[in-house]
Amino acid sequence: MVIGIGVDVVEIERFRRSLERTPSMRDRLFTVGELAALADRVDPVPGLAARFAAREATMKSLGLGLGAFGFHDVWVRRLEGGAPELVVEGRALELATAAGVGRWHLSLSHVDSVAVAYVVAE
């Protein structure tokens, strides 16, 4: 049963400027694994923007706002075939469990100007 749906869109260039202005944001927002997974890309910012959107979409799927859980409580890893997988831990997992969520679906995409994440909580 679907418990919630969340979608978030991030303007890539605006996100890039934020990262340039505040370099410490990368470590605050993303796990070491996420940063390492994108380190070999010519431009990792679109992928980072999509992963940030995944966090926001997850909050929305639970009916929560920014600050409900830490940014490292939700992160994205790639499965062997390349599909993104949402990992939910810590406070986010507690809130999701209380809401009855036992399964997540995640879709990420980005084009020149925007990154989008779509999350379904079941």
Predicted regions and their residues:
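Core catalytic alpha/beta fold that binds nucleotide/phospho-ligands
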Residues: 1-122
